[in-house]
């Protein structure tokens, strides 16, 4: 590990205020080990240790043993597929199956005497109480996209490979069909499955980060003292800020006006430089994976998950020229409440942990080095365009007829 001294910390502080970037624009190189036993299959033909995403394959250092099965809660139609999968993993594959305690305690499972022997062998855990991050080799999701998002939230560091079966409503992130689950799961256990590394956002919520003058912030962004557009030394205080929340986010961070009737008014900084103020219903900061979710509904472009980028999308901005933008994955974004904002703002992370943002608070966002290794059904290009076509009906319209066909029909009518 690199030893951080007062001298190196001072150089970083000088670099920040001199306008020099402290982040690599392409973002951090993603971790290539997923959980205790999975990793990317090394490619000897890769140049400069940068592997082509299309050639990324899953391999196992040791045979997988512990499988986490995540099931969509309160959906009775998933009870039978869940029992069938657990029976297959325990009896035929001799796996240790982990499930949430609330799933194992479900009344439907408790009443099934035929499933009792399997149920007694399930390992259970409680979200927020039990740490299972170091013992899970593979995650299998039964449900929709929300199930995959929930699975991602359980692992705030390295994420084991995720295999998602489409048993929900939309299924953009769930490429596998459950009808062939035995064959597909067996292939994954053998290794060499194609994977997509879905980047996540590393998010910090810092309370009282911005210094105040007489308990009052500057009246407008134009009055904030800046040096070449950068926040000057003394405007922020690293010792004053307290990190109250740190999360890994797969889809998006949403900052909005909450229950207030006023426009939200937040300032957006990129690597310490104020780039704009957002006046409207709010702003969405999303990963390429999240670009097909809330951001797409707000008018953003859809980005393939292997493109290293961060999408910034305004929500109903009170400006005709405020278009969504794509920034490099390695930058650090910071969102603060504008000094002249009439109300507070609210922030949520993948639709969860919603909380209020006050004057002086800030949200720091950058790309995480811990992606979600999503196992592909076919390959990372085919799966994505298949989801665009099947789930979002991308570019669906009635086909235009050939000119020859039109001429023939008009001649017949005459």
Model segments located where?
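N-terminal low-complexity/intrinsically disordered extensions
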Residues: 1-138, 179-250, 255-261, 267-277, ...
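Short glycine/serine/threonine-rich phosphate/pyrophosphate-binding segments
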Residues: 78-79, 146-152, 291-297
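Short gly/pro/ser/thr-enriched loop/turn and capping motifs at secondary-structure boundaries
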Residues: 105-106, 168-173, 301-303, 318-320
């Amino acid at each position: 590990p690199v030893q951080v001294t007062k001298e190196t910390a001072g150089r970083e502080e000088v670099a920040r205020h001199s306008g020099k970037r402290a982040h690599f624009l392409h973002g951090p190189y993603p971790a290539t080990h997923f959980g205790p036993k999975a990793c990317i299959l090394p490619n000897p033909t890769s140049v400069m240790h940068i592997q082509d995403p299309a050639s990324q394959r899953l391999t196992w250092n040791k045979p997988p043993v512990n499988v986490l099965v995540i099931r969509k809660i309160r959906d009775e139609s998933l009870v039978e597929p869940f029992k069938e999968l657990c029976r297959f993993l325990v009896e035929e594959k001799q796996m240790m199956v982990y499930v949430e305690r609330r799933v194992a305690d479900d009344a439907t499972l408790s009443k099934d005497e035929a499933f009792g022997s399997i149920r007694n062998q399930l390992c259970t855990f409680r979200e927020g109480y039990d740490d299972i991050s170091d013992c899970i080799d593979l995650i299998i999701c039964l449900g929709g996209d929300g199930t995959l998002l929930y699975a991602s939230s359980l692992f705030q560091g390295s994420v084991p490979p995720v295999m998602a079966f489409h048993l929900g409503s939309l299924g953009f992130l769930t490429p596998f069909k459950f009808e062939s689950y035995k064959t597909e799961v067996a292939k994954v256990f053998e290794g060499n499955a194609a994977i997509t590394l879905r980047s996540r956002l590393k998010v910090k919520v810092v309370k009282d980060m911005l210094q105040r003058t007489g308990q009052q912030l500057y009246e407008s962004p134009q009055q904030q003292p800046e040096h070449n557009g950068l926040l000057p030394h003394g405007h922020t205080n690293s010792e004053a800020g307290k990190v109250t929340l740190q999360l890994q986010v797969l889809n998006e961070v949403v900052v909005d006006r909450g229950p207030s009737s006023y426009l939200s008014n937040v300032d957006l900084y990129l690597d310490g430089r104020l780039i704009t103020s957002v006046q409207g219903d709010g702003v969405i900061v999303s990963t390429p994976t999240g670009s097909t979710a809330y951001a797409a509904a707000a008018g953003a472009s859809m980005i393939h998950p292997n493109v290293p980028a961060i999408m910034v999308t305004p929500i109903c901005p009170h400006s005709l020229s405020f278009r969504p933008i794509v920034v490099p994955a390695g930058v650090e974004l910071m969102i603060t409440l504008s000094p002249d904002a009439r109300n507070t703002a609210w922030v949520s992370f993948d639709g969860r942990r919603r909380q209020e943002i006050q004057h002086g608070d800030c949200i720091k966002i950058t790309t995480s080095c811990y992606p979600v290794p999503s196992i592909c059904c076919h390959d990372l290009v085919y799966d994505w365009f298949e989801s665009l076509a099947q789930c979002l009906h991308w570019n669906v319209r009635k086909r235009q007829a050939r000119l020859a066909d039109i001429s023939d029909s008009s001649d017949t009518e005459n």
